[in-house]
A protein has these predicted regions:
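Long, hydrophobic, amphipathic alpha-helical segments used as structural scaffolds
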Residues: 37, 41-44, 87, 91-98, ...
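Acidic carboxylate diad motif detector
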Residues: 53-159, 298, 304, 308
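Stable alpha-helical structural segments in soluble proteins, enriched in small hydrophobic residues
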Residues: 36, 79-90, 372-382
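Gly/serine-rich nucleotide phosphate-binding loop at the start of the catalytic core
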Residues: 1-77
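Positively charged, helix-rich recognition surfaces that bind polyanionic ligands
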Residues: 6, 16, 20, 31, ...
Length: 390
């Protein structure tokens, strides 16, 4: 039976002594990570072509306080692994100068450390972290949903001033009954997605309210003196508002993707290059060297809408859930002209503009809703690709 990784996040309130120990662990994790970043930054093609990165033992020998730290040794090893992942991500994007590993800071909103050698038992209603760190009380409403025998790691995290215990399990996937539906999905800016059934789905209004709250908190932050106590408090309020937006969007996408997987055996969706679609509009200059209006403002608005919708994360959720539950998920090439083709007769309307939400086919005279027609074409092309690949 296939296995998947699932996590459960449990909020808890540590005692003053335990909170102090956890803060020491966060500090030890930051120190270990920053040692790797410092070594990475010391690279020099001539003077230091192969810098030696310190291991856990090296850091403990050189720093006596680290030997006495309550942080588990596996957490320090995981910190080094986290740095290597960040380093690999940087090298993948090196040509763009992005994702360079940066120093971890005590002022970062999220502090965490991960232990991959967990205890797999409970002491009553408490889960033991380690001998030095003590245990965490699990409230009845947060009871652990999966067997502890399948626990692979735990992470203690402090986010927006709240402590969380995040448990990661390897659990068997329960097979779902075969569904009969087939659906094509067209992603959009005006509507989050349009289905080939004609249904259009948008984020709930609550998301707009949360985004307004972010803007409100940011305006308050702009009026604070940088570095002051009020500035730090307001910065935490901004981070909390952002986290609410992120969690709401993630929850909505999980519920929607689960419903689509539950109802359909075959799902077709277009493949979009979000990074290319959200590039800045190039500036144009007139004869005097002054910038001319070329739709940059409209492009910025569209970029924000595209990034806000989170198309890539939604596609990833559909892909792995389809794999879990035996569904077929096919993505159509981004250059496929799904909006321009008539679903009924195949006529191609080459002059279709972005502002045209409906158009009449010159081949058969049918009135098309732009997005519904695109979703139908995506479903047809995905079925064709699936049959060709068999």
């Amino acid at each position: 039976m296939p296995v998947r990784k699932v996590s459960q996040r449990i909020p808890f309130t540590p005692s003053k002594t335990q909170a102090a120990l956890l803060e020491q662990c966060f500090g030890a994790r930051r120190f270990a990570y920053n040692q790797q970043v410092e070594t990475f930054n010391s690279y020099d093609k001539d003077a230091n072509p192969r810098p030696k990165y310190p291991g856990v033992t090296d850091m403990k020998v050189a720093n006596e306080w680290l030997r006495d730290s309550p942080i588990p040794s596996s957490a320090l090893s995981n910190t080094i692994m986290d740095f290597r992942k960040a380093q690999a991500a940087y090298f993948r994007q090196a040509e763009y100068g992005k994702n360079r590993p940066r120093f971890a800071s005590k002022s970062d909103n999220i502090q965490s450390f991960r232990n991959t050698v967990p205890m797999r038992h409970m002491d009553g209603n408490r889960y033991p972290l380690s001998r030095k760190l003590g245990s965490v009380r699990i409230r009845r409403r947060d009871r652990i949903r999966y067997p502890l025998e399948s626990l692979s790691s735990w992470t203690v995290k402090r986010e927006n001033g709240v402590y969380y215990l995040v448990l990661l399990f390897n659990v068997d996937i329960q097979p779902k009954t075969k569904a009969s539906g087939e659906v094509g999905i067209d992603l959009g800016v005006k509507d989050f997605l349009t289905l080939s059934t004609g249904e259009k789905v948008n984020y709930p209004d609550r998301l707009h309210q949360l985004e307004e709250k972010v803007r409100w908190e940011q305006r308050k932050l702009s009026r604070r003196v940088k570095g002051s106590s009020n500035y730090r408090k307001q910065k935490a309020a901004v981070a909390k508002a952002y986290a609410k937006v992120s969690h709401f969007r993630e929850n909505f996408q999980h519920q929607l993707s689960h419903k689509l997987i539950e109802d359909n055996q075959f799902i077709g969706m277009e493949m979009l290059a979000v990074q290319n679609m959200t590039r800045k509009a190039k500036k144009k200059l007139d004869a005097n060297g002054k910038p001319v209006r070329n739709g940059q403002a409209r492009k910025r608005v569209m970029n924000r809408s595209i990034l806000r919708n989170g198309w890539n994360s939604f596609a990833e959720k559909l892909a792995y859930k389809a794999q879990w539950y035996g569904r077929t998920f096919v993505q159509v090439d981004r250059f496929y002209p799904s909006s321009r083709l008539c679903h009924d007769c195949g006529y191609k309307y080459a002059g279709l503009r972005l502002s045209e939400r409906e158009w009449v086919c010159e081949g058969c005279g049918v009135l098309h809703d732009r997005d519904v027609n695109a979703a139908l074409n995506i479903l047809g092309e995905a079925l064709r690709l699936s049959q060709a690949g068999e």
